Amino acid sequence: MTGWKDIPPVPTAQEFIDIVLSRTQRRLPTQIRPGFKISRIRAFYTRKVKFTQETCSEKFGAIISSFPVLSDQHPFHRDLMNILYDADHFKVALGQISTAKNLIETISRDYVRLLKYAQSLYQCKQLKRAALGRMATLIKRLKDPLIYLDQVRQHLARLPDINPTTRTLLVAGFPNVGKSSFVRSVTRADTPVEPYAFTTKSLFVGHLDYKYLRYQVIDTPGILDHPLEEMNTIEMQSVTALAHLRAAVLYFMDISEQCGFSLKAQINLFKSIKPLFANKMVFIVLNKMDIKKFEELDPEMQQEINDLTKSGEVEILRASCATQEGVQEVKNHVCERLLVERVSQKLKAGTHSNGNIGTRLQEVMARIHVATPMDGTTRETFIPEAVKNLKKYDKNDPNRRVLARDIEEANGGAGVFNVDLRKDWILENPEWKYDKIPEIFDGKNVYDYIDPDIDAKLQALEEEEERLEKEGFYDEDDDLPDEEEEEILQKAEYIREQHALIRNEAKMRKSLKNRAIIPRKAVKKPLSQLEDHLDQLGVDTEAIGLRARAQTAQSSRGRSLVRSRGTTADPDAMDIDDGAASAKERLARSRSRARSVAATNRLQDGVQGTTLRSKAERQAKLAQRKMNRMARQGEADRHIHASMPKHLFSGKRTIGKTDRR
């Protein structure tokens, strides 16, 4: 299989430009402003240039890779393409595509380098325009190569799929000698048949089946008897097929000479192209026998035709495509000979010089070998006597065999009679057929748990238990735990409890409890915690406690809650200034008490620094924005309002009423 039919279409130069530029316009952003940063403007236009270059390279690479590489093709396909399309012209066209691809990549690199130094949007735009313009100019110059490659693609898709390695029959000869008629007769190929020469201008392929094997039949154009240099493209296709295909060659000759060429000329053509028949099976087919028989020829001409078979490599066959006389015989004979020849070639190729059969040949022989009995005796068909004497069932015969259907009809018919499904059960004891044992119990198959030796196994287990009881096996208390094991178990349980407590305390510490995480430096620790920690370290804390309490006493401020009311015990008595009170105390009592200030600012608790505080406020506003936009009363508001208020959408939308809806 060549895969030439899967080559995608090659666009023309103008179509190629439209594809590339429209793809660039569709796939990339299209808006840019002079006020943007110059780096952003450069990146915008650099991306356009590089994207266009990548698109061109991708398209050109796809075109180059889709066409076959001549050096990788079979010699037949390589020479056929050389004849039809001129291999040099084909290579030059693909080379121009590859050169254009490299030039476009060079242009892209140069203009990307220039775009790095552009100072304005106008400069970037002009550089981009120049780069894309140069790329488009290069593509326009590929007008002729692209048209040529698309024509080659179309012609390749129309070529027949010829397999050079399969079983092949190759039909050759002068024009109008009946080659296409033979191919139409033995295959389903619709080859053109007309009463004039050179009806077939290219290779046609048909397929036939012989002994469950597929053969391909190739109809070649007619060949004229002149030097190879003077042959045209149509004739060279036939010569290429004869030279490179391992096939059985059927050389057709028109002995009635109605083709316009004499029998002598047909014999001379056979001799001139005979070097192309090397290592091939050759058959001369004498066609149009219904018009003129071989025996009606001149003795000299008969002798010349018979001389062609002296080498032993050529056979003469006779047929008439008009009356189908001898056509199937020719087909069967050639296919059989070709099959035998291919098998012998495989056997010869798989045998080593020392006569041993290779591994590959053994695999092939294993596939084609048919096993037969070694003793040579004939094994006839054996039919038991009971089968021979078996009478045909007759419903009206009283001595007929009684079938289950007869029993059913005798006992009430279908729906009344229950078929005995256990009747034909094969059990060790026929009495077991009707035991009340369910097939399925608790969703399990009962038969899977039935053991024929279960009674013997149960008896053995009971005897073993009695023996163990007599030996005192169950009197030992080794399994009871001692004091050491109980102590180990208690310690293990205590360790598990401690681990659980530690884990729970860690979870409680880490949980926020609906509070913000306060930094360690902002947490105020009591003096008692400090004293406990220092006591654990062995530091005397008496002096530290006295100093802290003294600082606390000095920093205490505010009015005393108890005012001196002299010596009277009456709570309603008038305040009297004691002469012993200092002026400082009197001044403090005369001032009004200020509002109490909270110990900490809850709004700023847990947020350290102005930057973090402003960031937290912005995030809070951002979280609140959606709720405000959707007019929610809070986070728990899930009310869904009417999507189409009836007072706004009722009535008909008449002409002139849709501008307000």
UniProtKB/Swiss-Prot annotation:
Family that this chain belongs to: Belongs to the TRAFAC class OBG-HflX-like GTPase superfamily. OBG GTPase family. NOG subfamily.
Annotated region (Disordered), positions in chain: 549-578
GO annotations of cellular component type: nucleolus
Stored InterPro entries: G_OBG (IPR031167), GTP-bd (IPR006073), NOG1 (IPR024926), NOG1_N (IPR041623), NOG1_Rossman_fold_dom (IPR010674), NOG_C (IPR012973), P-loop_NTPase (IPR027417)
Domain OBG-type G positions: 167-339
Chief localisation class: nucleus
Reported function: Involved in the biogenesis of the 60S ribosomal subunit.
GO terms, molecular function: GTP binding; metal ion binding
CDD domains assigned: NOG (cd01897)
Tree of life domain: Eukaryota
Pfam family, one: NOGCT
SUPFAM superfamilies: P-loop containing nucleoside triphosphate hydrolases
Keywords: Coiled coil, GTP-binding, Magnesium, Metal-binding, Nucleotide-binding, Nucleus, Ribosome biogenesis
Compartments it resides in: Nucleus, Nucleolus
Biased composition (Low complexity): 555-566
Keyword rRNA-binding in record: no
The name this protein goes by in its record: Nucleolar GTP-binding protein 1
GO biological process: ribosome biogenesis
Positions annotated to bind Mg(2+): 180, 200
Transmembrane segments annotated in the record for this chain: none
Binding site for GTP: 173-180, 198-202, 219-222, 287-290, 320-322
